[in-house]
UniProtKB/Swiss-Prot annotation:
Family, similarity comment: Belongs to the TRAFAC class translation factor GTPase superfamily. Classic translation factor GTPase family. LepA subfamily.
SUPFAM superfamilies linked to this entry: EF-G C-terminal domain-like, P-loop containing nucleoside triphosphate hydrolases
Protein's name according to its UniProt entry: Elongation factor 4
This protein's encoding gene: lepA
GO biological process, one term: positive regulation of translation
Record-listed E.C. numbers: 3.6.5.n1
Disulfide bonds: none
Length: 599
C-alpha cells in the first residue's frame, strides 16, 4: 500500500465512560483484527490495572484494514487515548500522530469538560474533528440536545453527527464510512529521507526498547541503521511492524503509517518519547515538533519499606519513566523513612496508578508521603526559590512572601447541581471567574488553590453533583497567600514526613483533625504517646495515645496501702524510663492520614 490516499490516522477523544474502548473493540471486530475466540472486552486496555478501574491509562495503537462501500480497502491506524484529566499528556502525544479525531459523546450525558479540553487540543493541532454520538440504544439518549450542546460548548458543526451504539454494534459501520470520507489522508513522501516521530516507547526485557512511531516521510525496514536525533546514537533495526492488535512484523513502515520499531536499544533513555528518528545516512533531517514537556503538579515522596530494595526501586522508576515520560523523580532522604525518591505526578490518579504499577509490575513495597504542590517563595535576600517538600521549607524569618499555585478550573455541571458545586468551590477558597449557561448545563470557571484541588476535590465534586459534574483544570499563576508549615511531633520529636503546608485559616482545624486521625492509627504502646501539631513553636493541637498498663495490684489481696503504693510508684518509674528510650513505629496508614482529612 504505497498510496498514501488509502491511509487514515485517527484517534478517539472522549470523556471517561463514554464508550471509547468499546467502540475500539467494535472496530477491531468489524475489520477482522482478531479471531472470535480472542475477542474480549476492552482489547486495547492491556494493563490489568486499566481493566480493573475501567479506564485507559496508556496510549495504544492498532492497524486495521477496512473495505469501504466504494470497494477500496483503507488502512486505518487508530491510536487510543486516555480520557482522564491526569493523562492529558498521553492525549496530546496521540493526537500529534493523527490527521483526525473522533469526538465520542455519550448521547445520554452530553458533553463533559474533559472532552472539551481534549477537543480544543485537537483543533489547535489542526486535526479534523468528527462528532459521534454513542450509547444511542439507552432510554435516556437525547441526540438532538447533545448535538446542540456540542455546537454551543465546543463550537463545531454537529448537525449531521453519526449516531451509533458501540455496545450493540448499531451504526458502527456508518461511523467507519464517515471516517474514511471525513478524515484527510496523511501527507508525506516515501522518496524523502526517513523522518519518524516517537509517540510512545516501553521497555521489554527481551527486546530492549520498543518504540511506537508515526512515519512522516521516507520508509524504514529491517537492517536499516537509524539515528536517534536527541542522543545522536545509531542503532540497527531488528524488526518493524504494526499492531493488529497483536504484534505483527511487516517488511517496512512507510510514510503516513503508524507502527513499532525494535532496534535492540538497551539503554532505558535511548529513545525518548517525542523524539525524531532518521536513517544514519541522512543525519541532517529536521527534528519534528515533539510535544511540550509537561510539568508535574503534585509531588510526593516514595520510599521502599526495606532499604535493600532501593536499587530495584531506582531501576523500576527508570523503566516506568521511559513509558510514562510525565513522571519525574529525584533522590531524597528522610529521617523517618530512610532513602527514597521525590516523584512528580500530574495529579492524584496518576500518583495512585504509578504506585500501584510499581507494586504490581516490579514487586516493591512502598510507603508514600502526603502529596504537596510546588510553592514559590520570595526570600528576604531577594532570591526566589521553589519548594516541593514541606520539610525543605526555610526558616519563616527568612521568607518575605509565600505564593501558592492557582489553577483555572472549568467545571461543567447540570443546573440542578450548580448550588452544591459553588458551595464546594467557596469552601476550597475558590474565586469565581465566569459562568455560562449552555442549554441545561452550566459552565463555571473558578480560580482555585492547587493545594485544595489535588487532594480530594475531584471526588468531592463528583459526590456533590451525583457524578454529573466534570472538571478540567490547568495551572494559571502563583499568588501570595498566608501559608504556614504544620509540623507533627510524636513524643516531642518532629516527623519530617508528616509536615504539611497549609493556609493559616485552616491550620488549627487541620492540626486538630490530623492529630485525632493519627491517634486512631498509631498502635498503643507501653507508655503514653503524645501527638502534637505545631506551627513554628506554637502547639495548636494535641492528643495522647493512652498507655497499655498491666494491673500490678492484682497479686495484693487486701494488705497495706503502702505496699500498693510502692508497686504503683515502681510501675510509674518504669514507664517514665521506657518513655525516654522508647521508639514509636509509625504505620503506613498514618502517613496517608493526611489525605483522608475530611476538610
Amino acid at each position: 500500500m504505497s498510496d498514501l490516499s488509502h491511509i487514515r490516522n485517527f484517534s478517539i477523544i472522549a470523556h471517561i465512560d463514554h464508550g471509547k474502548s468499546t467502540l475500539a473493540d467494535r472496530f477491531i471486530q468489524m475489520c477482522g483484527g482478531l479471531a472470535e475466540r480472542e475477542m474480549e472486552a476492552q482489547v486495547l486496555d492491556s494493563m490489568d490495572l486499566e481493566r480493573e478501574r475501567g479506564i485507559t491509562i496508556k496510549a495504544h495503537s492498532v492497524t486495521l484494514y477496512y473495505k469501504a462501500r466504494d470497494g477500496i480497502t483503507y488502512q486505518l491506524n487508530f491510536i487510543d487515548t486516555p480520557g482522564h484529566v491526569d493523562f492529558t499528556y498521553e492525549v496530546s502525544r496521540s493526537l500529534a500522530a493523527c490527521e483526525g479525531a473522533l469526538l465520542v459523546v455519550d448521547a445520554g450525558q452530553g458533553v463533559e469538560a474533559q472532552s472539551v479540553a481534549n477537543c480544543y487540543t485537537a483543533i489547535e493541532q489542526g486535526l479534523e474533528v468528527m462528532p459521534v454520538l454513542n450509547k444511542i440504544d439507552l432510554p435516556q439518549a437525547d441526540p438532538e440536545r447533545v448535538k446542540e450542546e456540542i455546537e454551543k460548548i465546543i463550537g463545531i458543526d454537529a448537525t449531521d453527527a453519526v449516531t451509533c451504539s458501540a455496545k450493540t454494534g448499531l451504526g458502527v459501520d456508518e461511523v467507519l464510512e464517515r471516517l474514511v470520507t471525513t478524515i484527510p489522508a496523511p501527507t508525506g513522501n516515501i522518496e524523502d529521507p526517513l523522518q519518524a516521530l516517537i509517540i510512545d516507547s516501553w521497555f521489554d526485557n527481551y527486546l530492549g526498547v520498543v518504540s511506537l512511531v508515526r512515519v512522516r516521510h521516507g520508509r524504514v525496514k529491517k537492517g536499516d541503521k537509524i539515528l536517534v536525533k536527541s542522543t545522536g546514537k545509531i542503532h540497527l533495526v531488528d524488526s518493524v511492524g504494526v499492531f493488529n492488535p497483536k504484534h505483527t512484523a511487516t517488511t517496512d513502515l512507510k510514510a503516513g503509517e503508524v507502527g513499532f520499531i525494535i532496534a535492540g536499544i538497551k539503554d532505558i533513555h535511548g529513545a525518548p518519547v517525542g523524539d525524531t528518528l532518521t536513517l544514519s545516512s541522512t543525519p541532517d533531517v529536521e527534528v519534528l515538533p515533539g510535544f511540550k514537556r509537561i510539568q508535574p503538579q503534585v509531588y510526593a515522596g516514595l520510599f521502599p519499606v526495606s532499604s535493600d530494595d532501593f536499587e530495584d526501586f531506582r531501576e523500576a522508576l527508570q523503566k516506568l519513566t521511559l513509558n510514562d515520560s510525565s513522571l519525574q523523580y529525584t533522590p531524597e532522604s528522610s529521617d523517618a523513612l530512610g532513602f527514597g525518591f521525590r516523584c512528580g505526578f500530574l495529579g492524584m490518579l496518576h500518583m495512585e496508578i504509578i504506585q500501584e504499577r510499581l507494586e504490581r509490575e516490579y514487586d516493591l513495597d512502598l510507603i508514600t508521603t502526603a502529596p504537596t504542590v510546588i510553592f514559590e517563595l520570595q526570600l528576604k535576600n531577594g532570591e526566589t526559590i521553589y519548594v516541593d517538600n514541606p520539610s525543605k521549607l526555610p526558616d519563616l524569618s527568612a521568607i518575605e512572601d509565600m505564593r501558592e499555585p492557582i489553577v483555572r478550573a472549568n467545571i461543567l455541571v447540570p443546573q440542578e447541581h450548580l448550588g452544591n458545586v459553588i458551595t464546594l468551590c467557596i469552601e476550597k477558597r475558590g474565586v469565581q471567574h465566569d459562568m455560562l449557561f449552555l442549554g441545561s448545563q452550566v459552565q463555571v470557571t473558578y480560580d482555585l488553590p492547587m493545594n485544595e484541588v489535588v487532594l480530594d476535590f475531584f471526588d468531592r465534586l463528583k459526590s456533590t453533583s451525583r457524578g454529573y459534574a466534570s472538571l478540567d483544570y490547568h495551572f494559571d499563576r502563583y499568588q501570595s497567600a498566608n501559608l504556614v508549615k504544620l509540623d507533627v511531633l510524636i513524643n516531642g520529636e518532629k516527623v519530617d514526613a508528616l509536615a504539611l503546608i497549609v493556609h493559616r485559616d485552616n491550620a488549627h482545624y487541620k492540626g486538630r483533625a490530623l492529630t485525632e486521625k493519627m491517634k486512631e492509627l498509631i498502635p498503643r504502646q507501653m507508655f503514653d504517646v503524645a501527638i502534637q501539631a505545631a506551627i513554628g513553636g506554637q502547639i495548636v493541637a494535641r492528643t495522647t495515645v493512652k498507655a497499655l498498663r498491666k494491673n500490678v495490684l492484682a497479686k495484693c489481696y487486701g494488705g497495706d496501702v503502702s505496699r500498693k503504693r510502692k508497686l504503683l510508684e515502681k510501675q510509674k518509674a518504669g514507664k517514665k524510663r521506657m518513655k525516654q528510650v522508647g521508639n514509636v513505629e509509625i504505620p503506613q496508614e498514618a502517613f496517608l492520614a493526611v489525605l483522608r482529612l475530611d476538610s
